[in-house]
A protein has these predicted regions:
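Carboxylate-rich, polar loop motifs that coordinate divalent cations or form catalytic acidic clusters
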Residues: 1-307
Length: 307
């Protein structure tokens, strides 16, 4: 039976009729959850509750109930990740975790304070990854690797800014500006590929596809990456008339790709590069910039964040 794709969009309500070729869409208006106008990242706990890195704090969607937990320093939460019974978050010059108390409310503990971690000036944490029983907090300047059991902390300091970090095929990768793609091996950064394209374009997504490493650049090109070679991987998004700039991407549980653009909406593509849907303002999306995409396995839905 064909799986129905549900897309939940934030901030705008649209009352028009959908074409039969467009998947059903449910939208949440800003007034429904009454918090910041931008969500930067999403995660889901084992009970199915959704958590969003919101401009005003940690935003929770449990069933139909929205709830906001303000960040302790009142800064924007940039990253969020559910691991076990904790919801980890990263923000401006701080990162830590949230745990539910006896009343069902989430309380925050700063790992920066608890572990006496020296934070760099104006450092923000844009991604959180769970890898080999370690938790990785990524800022533009470095990777902070935490072993939560013994609270041991290690640091990786590239010489140039970190553009993105990924967990793919049981490996941890990061892209360093002007240097290329690196992986982490035994706590050390090792160069994977320093081809010219990886020094100039930003990888917004890195995936396993049919046993190979597949990267999506912000300049609307897919690349197969192997050892120190890189090959352009053809897809139908290159045939679109618009020049696309990608900002977000996710591989879904059925091997399709959900791709978010700046100013050109949302694209759904299969594992062979075939375009399935391109939804933008003309399809009813009120804002064409997609900050993040997430595949929710428990509720068979895709969440898209709009700017």
């Amino acid at each position: 039976m064909l799986r129905i794709l549900k897309i939940l969009l934030f901030f705008h309500v649209y009352n028009g009729l959908w074409s039969q070729t467009i998947p059903p869409i449910q939208k949440y208006d800003l007034q429904e959850y009454e918090v910041g106008t931008q969500n930067w990242m999403i995660t889901q706990d084992d009970e199915g509750s959704m958590f969003f890195a919101n401009n005003e704090g940690l935003l929770e969607l449990s069933g139909s109930r929205w709830r906001i937990y303000p960040n302790r320093n009142e800064s924007i939460i940039r990253s969020v990740k559910s691991i076990g019974d904790r919801i980890y978050s990263g923000s401006y010059m701080d990162f830590g975790f949230w745990v539910k108390d006896a009343k069902g409310n989430y309380q925050y503990t700063s790992l920066v304070e608890t572990l006496n971690i020296e934070i760099l000036e104006n450092e923000e944490f844009w991604n959180i990854l769970n890898y080999n029983n370690r938790i990785i907090f990524q800022s533009l300047n470095r990777l902070i690797i935490l072993e939560p059991i013994n609270e041991e902390v290690k640091f990786i300091h590239p010489k140039n800014p970190i553009l993105k970090s990924f967990k793919v095929m049981d490996r941890l990768f990061f892209q360093e500006s002007q240097s290329g793609l690196f992986s982490i091996n035994n706590g050390q950064a090792e160069l994977v590929n320093d081809q010219k394209v990886l020094k100039k374009e930003i990888l917004v997504g890195l995936f396993e596809n049919k046993g190979k490493l597949l990267g999506l650049s912000n300049q609307s090109c897919f690349y197969e990456i192997e050892n120190n070679s890189i090959t352009r991987w053809p897809s139908q998004i290159e045939t679109l008339k618009e020049k696309l700039t990608f900002y977000s991407a996710a591989k879904l549980g059925d091997d399709r790709f959900a791709l978010g653009t700046i100013s050109n909406g949302f694209i759904l593509m299969d594992s062979n590069g075939k375009l399935i849907h391109h939804m933008d303002y003309s399809s009813g999306i009120s804002n064409n910039t997609i900050l993040s995409v997430f595949d929710s396995a428990q509720i068979s839905a895709q969440f898209i964040f709009q700017k």
